[in-house]
């Protein structure tokens, strides 16, 4: 059986403050952002190979 990671979620205080690090220092791209009011978060999606990093900020 082959296991793979679909995504990794990382809680941040501010997406606006942290996205620069992920883009500029790590060279990742932001595929999109989304507010998810039912979960109380704003999420940014950053593809990482076959997986993705999800940065989550509380609303």
What label would you give each PLM region?
Residues 54-59:
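Intrinsic, low-complexity N-terminal interaction/targeting segments
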